[in-house]
Swiss-Prot record:
Enzyme superclass (EC): oxidoreductase
Protein name as catalogued: Pyruvate dehydrogenase E1 component
Organism: Mycobacterium tuberculosis (strain ATCC 25618 / H37Rv)
Name of the gene this protein is made from: aceE
Record-linked Pfam families: PDH_E1_M (PF17831), Transketolase_C_1 (PF22613), Transketolase_N (PF00456)
Record carries keyword Membrane: no
Cofactor (UniProt): Mg(2+); thiamine diphosphate
Role description: Component of the pyruvate dehydrogenase (PDH) complex, that catalyzes the overall conversion of pyruvate to acetyl-CoA and CO(2). AceE has reductase activity with pyruvate but does not react with 2-oxoglutarate.
Cellular component, GO, one term: peptidoglycan-based cell wall
Disordered, as annotated region: 1-21
Cross-link (Isoglutamyl lysine isopeptide (Lys-Gln) (interchain with Q-Cter in protein Pup)), chain numbering: 375
Catalytic activity line of the entry: N(6)-[(R)-lipoyl]-L-lysyl-[protein] + pyruvate + H(+) = N(6)-[(R)-S(8)-acetyldihydrolipoyl]-L-lysyl-[protein] + CO2
Record flagged with keyword Cell inner membrane: no
């Protein structure tokens, strides 16, 4: 392979009189194949540049090159853009807009908020409590939030619908402190910080948790990294609602506040390209660059602001840097030869952190003193003057200018990189210290210094009386500053954050819409994945509920048989379809549209869950209930994006999550990474997930109907359904006569009652794709081993477990009350014989109900890694096939003393259940996805 360097050498040595020079590779790696049509003019330009460099030096030469690039951009000359600029503010002083507020008034109550935020965390460390908290994050970002609260963040009563603000999790104390001044929270509630159950009257959650504070918080932003991901997809979903004509979101903006340390999370940056590709100019990231993460510097040897600027600019974002406060303006103006800018460019972040952990004299010597020219710039400044040189993120006007530029910018999302100091204004023991993130308390000396710098009217006596409980400060709702604060919120449409839980009601489809699924498939073999897709296809046809469905697919629509949705529903794309699809002449052509209904996310499960959350919480965010249906390979759901599903539960998302190609043995040939035998276990750990493992199409119909009623009915629940469906086709039976669906929804019902008169009885519990083998095992037991076995369909091991746990918890807490009986116990109480449970999942799945199964209980499952092979071979290996079930039943009967122990031994030998080679050949269709 010819390298770039080799091509460069070839280009230099291949000049000929008959062919103009061609520059193959420019030094920075940007390829160009344009011919040099005037070598003489080119030579003159290069000689002129060399002369300039020699006469004026590199600073002047660099400046002119940058100006030429800027002019080329203005003239729309197609050249590569620079990804990194000098370590100075993006917006020049002369272009800063007029600041519309009263800066003095806003500064005063900003100080009160800082004080109350720190005191709340400090008081939470009082003896007997000690629940932790974070003081320093909000201290560094107070100005960033307050500019937004006073001038940009619009509440839900705003005519445009209001903004969505993702607040950095560790900054929650400051948001509570503001709500205290607004009169939304009391001092008693602040004292309940991180004591949600033990504090009298209830407490406040540690971070933004909507489920724990449903009228206040909107967006959960811990764990770190999920905030930026979800903000991107929230902004995209706002456009989706607008483009489909569901809601006018054109005047709504999404703000996401982040920390520079958080940007190392893969989710923080991994989907930045989506914001650019979608042109999300309704989205602004504000990254608080205090240069510190939890234990130390983010980039001690580097420059995180420069790194993030290059990353986001390269990803197609508009980047605004807010590095220096107004006190630096005069120094930068006097920096005629660029010495100060050069110092700023070359000083690593570790040094900037150290400067703010010292004093003005240290900064004079170790920063300005590194160059005689910069040392001369500050020779008339005192050490205190130097110490008072603020960073940009603490300057109201600089921050306002950046926010105004961000909301006015069109065509791109914007990221604002604001430089701050962690622990700002908290005193010398906090500011810039590596340990500041873990510091929860202030000493008496710290309290007094903090009080003085913030000008809080609290006396020494009040602080000394009980240093564990320094007082909050509130001047009263009639104070001019508080009236000003509340006036600003009224003008902007109400309080932020605020979550509204009431939304418009939906008219659910009638039961007749599910009738086709309850008739069975006749002689046709149909996989439950196909049955599920057909169920939702029927729901989509409903004129009331259909437009509210949001199908979300990570590039597997054809695998799941959903390509038939492309022509009718179309794939959402803000730009429509600007090309001719290769399959345009086919009935099931790939069709994109700006009014498309399908969110086709590509190979991107993380982004798919982001869309699921945005759609599933639209009822609260927009008063527009939507019903997301997210379908994926089950192995790549809760295992890959379980953290996001936990956030979905916190945000109280509603919708359907479909784990397709489920099971450890069903997805033939795909192997270890695809063979899912445990997603139901992972789903069971999420309290908001209602998980089902249906075997038949009619069960799916009842489950979907129940899900719509529970999530979108008169009294909607804050849950989402997880339904595992399979790609193995088999005949779907019709709904039994006089069928009561309660068992389907509660988790278990008897599907097949043995009518044969046999010496012994047994019960087989089966779920999902294990059902056909269970029915065959029952036939074999009756025909060959004198055992009559009932077969039960277990649609939800998890719901049966929760029912049992709830009853036991009630008994523990109230032993004096009559005890309930778990549903599974009641179902099996009159069933004779041992109970054997089988599924295509790990044994731990059916083991969830062991405490409440009467009598002998034996479980079979697919423990261990999956592998590539046929279904019969895999099931023989895991011993979940019909033959293994027969042996398990006989073993249980022998253990109960009902048959001789030699019987299961003989059966095991007869069927060779320990020999994979003895498994039958695969006869069923391998199904899609294999």
């Amino acid at each position: 392979m010819t390298t770039d360097f080799a091509r460069h050498d070839l280009a230099q040595n291949s000049n000929s009189a008959s062919e103009p020079d061609r520059v193959r590779v420019i030094r920075e790696g940007v390829a160009s194949y344009l011919p040099d049509i005037d070598p003489e003019e080119t030579s003159e330009w290069l000689e002129s540049f060399d002369t300039l460099l020699q006469r004026c030096g590199p600073s002047r030469a660099r400046y002119l090159m940058l100006r030429l690039l800027e002019r080329a951009g203005e003239q729309r000359v197609a050249i590569p853009a620079l990804t990194s600029t000098d370590y100075v503010n993006t917006i020049p002083t002369e272009l800063e807009p007029w600041f519309p507020g009263d800066e003095d008034v806003e500064r005063r109550y900003r100080a009160w908020i800082r004080w109350n935020a720190a005191i709340m965390v400090h008081r939470a460390q009082r003896p007997g409590v000690g629940v932790g908290g974070h003081i320093s994050t909000y201290a560094s970002s107070a100005a960033l939030y307050e500019v937004g609260f006073n001038h940009f963040f619009r509440g839900k009563s705003h005519p445009g619908g209001g903004d969505q603000v993702f607040i950095q999790g560790h900054a929650s104390p400051g948001i509570y402190a503001r709500a205290f001044l607004e009169g939304r929270l009391t001092a008693e509630q602040l004292d309940g910080f991180r004591q949600e159950h033990s504090h009298v009257g209830g407490g406040l959650p540690s971070y933004p948790h909507p489920r724990l504070m449903p009228d206040f918080w909107e967006f959960p932003t811990v764990s770190m990294g999920l905030g930026p991901l979800n903000a991107i997809y929230q902004a995209r979903f706002n456009h989706y609602l607008h483009d489909r004509g569901i809601k006018d979101t054109s005047d709504q903006h999404v703000w996401c506040f982040l920390g520079d340390g958080e940007m190392d999370e893969p989710e923080s940056r991994g989907l930045a390209h989506v914001g650019a590709l979608e042109g999300l100019d309704n989205l602004t990231f504000v990254i608080n660059c205090n240069l510190q993460r939890l234990d130390g510097p983010v980039r001690g040897n580097g420059k995180i602001i420069q790194e993030l600027e290059s990353f986001f600019r390269g990803a197609g974002w508009n980047v605004i840097k807010v590095v220096w406060g107004r006190e630096w303006d005069a120094l930068l103006h006097a920096d005629r030869d660029g010495a100060l800018v050069n110092l700023m460019n070359t000083t690593p972040d570790g040094d900037y952190q150290t400067y703010k952990a010292n004093d003005g004299g240290y900064v004079r010597d170790h920063f300005f003193g590194r160059d005689p020219r910069t040392k001369a710039l500050v020779e008339n400044m005192s050490d205190q003057d130097i110490w008072n040189l603020k960073r940009g993120g603490h300057d109201y006007r600089k921050v306002y200018a950046a926010y105004r530029a961000a909301v006015d910018h069109k065509g791109q999302p914007t990221v604002i990189l604001a430089k701050t100091i962690k622990g700002y204004a908290l005193g010398k023991h906090f500011e810039g210290r590596n340990a500041t993130h873990q510091m929860k308390k202030l000493t008496l000396e710290d309290l007094k210094e903090f009080r003085d710098t913030q000008r809080i009217p609290v006396s020494d006596a009040q602080l000394e009386e009980n240093p564990y409980l320094p007082p909050y400060y509130h001047p009263g709702l009639n104070a001019p500053e508080i009236r000003y604060m509340l006036d600003r919120r009224r003008a902007l449409g109400g309080f932020v954050p605020e979550r509204r839980t009431k939304s418009k009601a939906l008219t659910l489809p009638g039961r007749d819409i599910y009738a086709p699924l309850k008739k069975g498939s006749g002689h046709q073999e149909v996989a439950t994945t196909m049955a599920t897709v057909r169920t939702f296809k029927e729901v989509l046809r409903d004129k009331q509920i259909g437009p509210r469905i949001v199908p979300i697919i990570p590039d597997e629509a054809r695998t799941f048989g959903m390509d038939s949705w492309f022509p009718s529903l179309k794939i959402y794309n803000r730009n429509g379809q600007l090309y001719t699809a290769v399959d345009a002449d086919l009935m099931l052509a790939y069709k994109e549209s700006e009014v498309g209904q399908i969110l086709h996310e590509g190979i991107n499960e993380a982004g798919s869950v982001g869309s699921f959350i945005a759609a599933g919480t639209s009822y609260a965010t927009h008063n527009e209930p939507m019903i997301p249906i997210y379908i994926f390979y089950s192995m790549f759901g809760f295992q890959r994006t379980g953290d996001s599903f936990w956030a979905a539960a916190d945000q109280m998302a509603r919708g359907f999550v479909l784990g397709a190609t489920a099971g450890r043995t069903t997805l033939t040939g795909e192997g270890l990474q695809h063979a899912d035998g445990h997603s139901l276990l992972l789903a069971a750990t999420n309290p908001a997930v209602v998980a089902y493992d249906p075997a038949f199409a009619y069960e799916i119909a009842y489950i979907v109907e129940s899900g719509l009623a529970r999530m979108c009915g008169e009294n909607p629940e804050n849950i989402f359904f997880y339904i595992t469906v399979y790609n193995e086709p088999y005949v779907q039976p019709p709904e039994p006569e006089n069928f009561d669906p309660e068992g389907v929804l509660r988790g278990i019902y008897r599907y097949h009652a043995a009518t044969e008169q046999r010496t012994n009885k047994a019960q087989i519990l089966a779920s999902g794709v294990a059902m056909p083998a269970a029915l065959r095992a029952a036939q074999m037991l009756a025909a060959e081993w004198d055992v009559a076995a009932d077969v039960w369909s277990v649609t939800s091991w998890g719901e049966l477990n929760r029912d049992g746990v709830a009853i036991e918890t009630e008994k523990l807490r109230h032993p004096d009350r009559p005890a309930g009986v778990p549903y599974v116990t009641r179902a099996l109480e009159n069933a004779r014989g041992p109970v054997i449970a089988v599924s295509d999942w790990m044994r731990a799945v059916p083991e969830q109900i062991r405490p409440w199964v009467p009598g002998t209980y034996l479980t079979l499952g697919t423990d261990g890694f999956g592998f590539s092979d046929t279904r019969p071979a895999a099931r023989r290996y895991f011993n979940t096939d019909a033959e293994s079930q027969v042996v398990a039943v006989l073993e249980a009967l022998a253990g109960d003393g009902e048959i001789d122990p030699s019987v299961p031994v003989a059966a095991a030998r007869q069927y060779r259940i320990d020999d994979v080679a003895a498994a039958p050949e695969q006869t069923t269709d391998p199904g899609p996805g294999a």
